[in-house]
């Protein structure tokens, strides 16, 4: 890559420090044109790699900022290219002036994700590790961060490469035997291959099995609050997140749209979704909100059904209870500070789901709710072991394709098909797994993945 790129790598907001990153074969020429040491004698192009230097950035004869400059020579850098990082003052204008000076002196503005893309193209990391960079930045909880860091350090890469190494060995063996049948025999080989396919497919399926947990770790547990109008759903949301995010009134139907907030429970994120109260209505706007509530319930990992214990159950409650079928759900027996019109035992009997008495008004029952969520989703114990978690939808899709190809290999063996059939499907599995690492993907997909990154990353 001939161009030298630059971008601001820190947030564009006032802070103590801002970082401008430069990468490319002319990075040292660029910094030498604009940097002056305190005494004016140091030649920045001649300093050792991986060293930091105090000085100033100048635009011609105009002093721009007081800085620290980190010099890193290829190949031991993030991108694999000569790299310079300028630590300047973190004011928005100060950072922009330093960047403008860098661009005036030979660098080009980087595209979103271009530094990480160069790291991938220069062999510093595979595609799964490159994607993990963004996952680390976007991690919302302890386990998401740990999972992303493991992936960045190569956990997914190792698991996939181990499977691919076994497959390519047998692909090569079959091809060699077909080319030279006099010296390489395939007698009894299909049975040996069947055992290999069984073992490697078990590993593929094990990785796929982690994807549901991986998705929850990365994206949060989609937790939908359902109930009739004025049951206390918005009060519950405000109580869970610790602020008045939703409007709370005595007027039924106040919430008409979806409200989403994240909370962290024992290191795991819950995406709490407050919905419009379920009821039949002629109000067009409210009806749209109710329809959205029904849609969100279908997609939910967990439903919190808020019941106003001070009013009898009706047909709206019956509809909501139908929506709980086949779902993980907790019934919240709300407004326990008022005279009850229904008993918690009835709700337990009708739904089969656990019932927790709460009073959103008096802030009672929240600890019990958190414990119930932990018990329901994690068997009472949230732990993060050394298992590799698949958290990326692209990785999951590639594993599913590989799994299907291995099924075809097994079917061909069991039906006594010619050996070249084995080789074709083994190669398909091998290439689909390679997509995870970026070894079998097109330029368009690579560009699409990195276009989602932040500037300066």
Residue ranges with predicted function:
Residues 53-65, 69-73, 253-281, 299-302:
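Switch I (G2) and immediately adjacent beta-strands of P-loop GTPase domains
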Residues 286-310:
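Inter-motif core of Ras-like GTPase G domains
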Residues 1-146, 150, 154, 330:
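A glycine-rich (often HGG/GG-containing) alpha/beta subdomain
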Residues 272, 306, 332:
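Generic enzyme active-site microenvironment
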Residues 108, 269-271, 354:
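Conserved beta-strand segments of alpha/beta enzyme cores
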Residues 2-8, 12, 142-264, 281-283, ...:
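C-terminal-of-GTPase-core extension/linker across diverse P-loop GTPases
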Residues 15-17, 50-52, 299-303, 326-329, ...:
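Short glycine-/polar-rich loops that comprise or flank the Walker A/P-loop
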Residues 241, 276-277, 301, 308, ...:
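Short glycine-/small-residue-rich Rossmann-like dinucleotide-binding loops
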């Amino acid at each position: 890559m001939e161009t030298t790129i630059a971008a601001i790598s820190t947030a564009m907001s006032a802070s103590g420090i801002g970082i401008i990153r430069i990468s490319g074969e002319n990075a040292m020429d660029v910094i030498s044109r604009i940097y002056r040491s305190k005494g004016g004698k140091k030649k920045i192009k001649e300093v050792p790699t991986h060293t930091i230097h105090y000085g100033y950035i100048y635009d011609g004869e105009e002093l721009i900022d007081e800085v620290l400059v980190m010099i890193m020579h290829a190949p031991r850098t993030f991108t694999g290219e000569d790299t310079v990082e300028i630590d300047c003052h973190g004011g928005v204008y100060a950072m922009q002036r330093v960047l403008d000076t860098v661009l005036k002196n030979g660098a080009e503005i980087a595209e979103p994700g271009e530094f990480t893309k160069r790291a991938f193209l220069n062999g510093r990391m595979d595609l799964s590790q490159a994607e993990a960079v963004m996952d680390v930045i976007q991690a919302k909880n302890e386990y998401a961060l740990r999972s992303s860091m493991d992936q960045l350090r190569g956990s997914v890469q190792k698991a996939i490469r181990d499977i691919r190494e076994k497959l390519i060995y047998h692909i090569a063996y079959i091809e060699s035997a077909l080319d030279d049948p006099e010296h390489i025999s395939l007698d009894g080989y299909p049975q040996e291959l069947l055992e290999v396919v069984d073992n490697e497919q078990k590993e593929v399926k094990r990785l796929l099995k982690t994807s549901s947990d991986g998705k929850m770790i990365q994206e949060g547990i989609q937790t939908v609050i359902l109930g009739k109008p004025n049951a206390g759903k918005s009060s519950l949301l405000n109580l869970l997140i610790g602020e008045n995010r939703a409007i709370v009134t005595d007027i039924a139907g106040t919430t008409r749209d979806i409200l989403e907030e994240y909370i962290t429970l024992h290191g795991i994120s819950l995406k709490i979704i407050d919905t419009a109260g379920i009821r039949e209505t002629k109000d067009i706007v409210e009806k749209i909100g109710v329809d959205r509530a029904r849609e969100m319930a279908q997609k939910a990992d967990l439903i919190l059904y808020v019941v106003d214990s001070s009013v009898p159950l009706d047909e709206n409650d019956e509809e909501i209870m139908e929506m709980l079928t086949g779902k993980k759900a907790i019934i919240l027996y709300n407004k326990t500070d008022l005279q009850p019109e229904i008993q918690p035992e009835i709700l337990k009997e009708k739904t089969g789901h656990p019932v927790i008495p709460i009073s959103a008004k008096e802030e009672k029952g929240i600890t019990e709710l958190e414990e119930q969520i932990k018990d329901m989703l994690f068997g009472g114990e949230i732990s993060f072991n050394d298992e590799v978690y698949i958290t990326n939808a692209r990785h999951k899709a590639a594993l599913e394709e590989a799994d299907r190809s291995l099924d075809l290999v097994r079917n061909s063996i069991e039906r006594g098909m010619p050996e070249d059939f084995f080789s074709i499907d083994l190669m398909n599995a091998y290439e689909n797994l390679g997509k995870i690492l970026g070894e079998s993907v097109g330029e368009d997909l690579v560009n699409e993945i990195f276009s989602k990154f932040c500037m300066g990353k």
